[in-house]
Amino acid sequence: MEDGKITTGQAASLPFVEQTVYHGRPADETGRLLKEIRTYDILDKLKIPFTRVDHQEIATVEACGELDKLLKSPLCKNLFLCNSQKTRFYLLMMPGRKRFITKEFCRQIGSPRLSFAPEEYMVKYLDITPGSVSVLGLANDTKKQVQLVIDRDILQGETVGCHPCINTSSLCIAMKDLLEKFLPYVEHDYIEVDLPWE
């Protein structure tokens, strides 16, 4: 059950359906996809509080400036990567303004060169489509095929912004809850990296 509105404001540069930040899940879930509802069910089960903004589809992190302000937490850049054999998969959470340097990332995790994974594997393992990639999708990775990797700057934040497996809503949750409640529940650990700002 949704706790209610906590703030309202115009976000002129983004086509929000609503310019309101809410506590918790939608009171009316009509038209919401099952994977989004499942995400709210898990967060509620784990007693993880969150704030939420509903909006039209947002395709890039660069388009999220006003959304960051409403949530009071920057959305991560989430990259879904794989090796050339498509046998090892990684979900990288990093600051949106950092540039992804493949060679440096691979060096830090001790992996051969990686590339962006095809959409079919994103759907297969995380039940997520491009633009909706989120750490919360690990709840769908029941066979543990995806290794989570988190940049140090994300880990040092008090909160993290992410999608509930669909990019028409964005959530803000406490980093502590992500690390101490959500990840143990979905039985995933993480590798820490420290990617450069260059």
Spell out what each predicted region is.
Residues 2-198:
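Extended, low-hydrophobicity, polar/charged segments
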